[in-house]
Each structure stands twice: as structure tokens, then as C-alpha cells.
Amino acid sequence: GFSPRVAPELDDVPIEHADQADETDMGFLTRLARLHDAVTKPVGERYVLARRGQVKAISGQELPVITLSVPPNNQPSEMAFINATVDRSSRVRFQGVRAAWFDGEEGVEATVEQGAGPFKRLRQSYQSAGEASAAAGGELRKIKRQAAKLRIECPGNPELAAEGLIQLDDTWPSYMRGEWSLDRVTARGSRRHGYRCVLEATWPEGREGD
């Protein structure tokens, strides 16, 4: 079996009640993690729960940052070709989150807010103010983290992995430079283009608002 490890900032997040039905233990934990913009996965002999977009490994250890450079002759016909896009379409849509909870003592539905307007309202109604506030905070972190979404197609590198970090150096346009947190890494291979990777990344925690 695995030894559990929970990031300190998630250790005291309130969960009043959650039902597990027709899903594996891993699926159940993944569903709970997503509610708080977190990720859960096995790492060695540990099963770890931590925030998405953190500037550290899921195991709690600092990750090496992999630097990517645009090659001098960046042409599609070259094996070293890099293609990248940044989507900032959701940057200013919401600045805050509202979540509802049922106040049993008063017999009314109440709301809590995280951030400032314009607000996104969560559809689910929560069982306590603490649970609603935690859910709103997790959604707000997700909104800030995904304010910029980076997609890169580049030469393959086995060190590139989800939850890792990349650094785009001065060979990149100014609006792309800096650290990014990898959300997904997809490896591809073909005779024509060789071993390639498609990277999907967002801002790491602490960089939001660049």
C-alpha cells in the first residue's frame, strides 16, 4: 500500500461529507482534489495530494527547472523546430468566486465570496461556510492560474513531466518568458519528425497576474 502525504495548505481544508459511488479510490480522491484545484497521484511509495501549479514537485521536493530556447533556425523542416501559442482569452472574465451554503440554523441559503467582482458563481451548494469558502478559494486559484495557457510543441525530452517547471529564456518573445507549470505532457513519435513533445502549461502559483 501507499503512505499518504498531504500538502500542509490542504491538510485543514474542510470536507463535511462526500459520497464515493461507482468509482475507484483513485477516482474518488481525484474528484475531491479537483474541487480545490489540486492534484493527487502516486509518487514512489507515497500517495500525494498537493496544489496544482505549485513551484515544487508533487512529492514536496523542489523540481529542477528545464530551460527551453528557441533555435536560431526555427523552421518547421528542422528537427529542433519549436511552435508555441499563448491563450489569455479568460484573463479578465472573472476576478472572484461566489459559493453558496445552506445555513440550517437560519433556514436560508447564504453565500461566501473570494476575490472581487466580476464573480463566478459555483453551481454546487455546500454544507457549511468553511466548505463553501474553501471551494471558492480553490476555484479562484484555478482562474488565476489559467489566466494564461501555454501550448508548446518541441523536441522530446524525458525530463518533461506534468507538475514540472519550464523556463522560457530570452530567445522567446517577452510575453512568453519566465517560468511555467506543466499541466500535461504528451509524447509523440514519427519517422519524419522524430521524438516530439506537446506541452500544456499555466502560470505557477505566485506568478499569477504577470
Task: List the predicted regions and their residue ranges.
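An acidic/polar, Gly/Ser/Thr-rich interaction patch typically located in mid-to-C-terminal regions
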Residues: 74-210
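Short beta-strand-centered interaction patches in the first periplasmic/extracellular domains
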Residues: 3-78
